[in-house]
Design a protein with these regions (language model features):
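Catalytic cores of secreted/periplasmic lytic hydrolases that degrade extracellular macromolecules
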Residues: 2, 20-191
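Bacterial N-terminal signal peptides that target proteins for export
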Residues: 2-9
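Bacterial N-terminal signal peptides
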Residues: 9-19
Length: 191
């Protein structure tokens, strides 16, 4: 009888443990997928990481990321998280400055090469999303190219997951893990 109660207890405990684990939504790894977060979700997460940022600007950028990513078939959660990684949550520094509207370091190759500048936030976001699409898939762009460096990514589709961006998009071998870390924090804050 004691053995039976023990087994029932262990079964109940394991059921509780595994059912609690299933509530956490795992972050996406495939770049060519659909984002889950709303502009408000992205904004709230971002502000928790950089409370001094301009909330209106962050919300605008979040909405642009959702719209442009949806158009090009790229995961907006991944693109937005990559912007957070590349800009230090809009703290910038290094070769890219805020007024450049360059949210992913496009063209900043070191040796003093500052990188691309874009006329508006929306154009800068579109260029980022299109550049990310070049790494994720060989499918053609939906919108006319805003990314002047799109043509240099060859072969197209060489990094379909966030982990493939390590050593391709960025030299850092831990780049994919850093991006996953931001996505995990985002999803834990939302789900």
């Amino acid at each position: 009888m004691r053995k039976r109660i023990f087994y029932i207890f262990i079964f109940g405990l394991s059921f509780l443990f595994f059912s609690c684990l299933s509530f956490f939504v795992r972050p996406p790894h495939l770049i060519e997928s659909r984002g889950r977060c709303s502009a408000e979700d992205l904004t709230v997460f971002f502000m928790s990481q950089n409370p001094k940022a301009d909330r209106a600007k962050v919300k605008r950028l979040a909405q642009f990321y959702i719209e442009e990513s949806e158009t090009e078939g790229i995961n907006s959660d991944i693109a937005f998280s990559q912007m957070c990684l590349e800009t230090g949550f809009l703290r910038f520094g290094g070769l890219v400055s805020e007024e450049m509207n360059n949210f992913c370091g496009l063209g900043s190759l070191g040796d003093g090469k500052k990188g691309e500048s874009f006329p508006s936030e929306k154009t800068g976001v579109l260029a980022h999303v299109q550049h990310l699409k070049a790494y994720a898939t060989a499918k053609p762009l939906v919108r006319p190219p805003a990314d002047p460096r799109y043509k240099y990514v060859n072969p197209k589709g060489k990094a379909p997951t966030i982990y493939g961006l390590a050593g391709t998009w960025a030299a850092d071998p831990n780049y994919g893990k850093k991006l996953e870390n931001i996505l995990t924090r985002l999803y834990k804050s939302v789900y």
